[in-house]
Amino acid sequence: MTPADLAVFDILGPMAYDVELADRLRELLADEHEVTEKQMFGGLAFLIAGHMAVCAGSRGDLLLRVDPAQTDALIEDPRASRYVMRGREMNGWLGVETDASMSDDELGRWVDHGVAFVRSLPPK
């Protein structure tokens, strides 16, 4: 760890998100424009034009923002569920169980949903 990493570690404690998942997300988003990373929701979020598209979540899952009208269809996938934060379902947000068995293509399809939705929003 660098001194800067240690300073962050001292303030925030250990990183709670899945570093491998964050790296995979970073690769999948490499060709996107206006991508920034920010610690949010106990994880590492990837924002596009200021809007959070996907996040390597604190539970080892993928958190993504989707068109609320597509939520019911998307949660038919057994890996996906409505995201719950502090006991409240978040409209337009999904949690997707990820693990090493999830292919890059499958992960990419989920990321595409998040990217497509935030690209439909005006930049912040």
Protein language model features and the residues they cover:
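Charge-dense, helix-prone N-terminal extensions
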Residues: 1-124
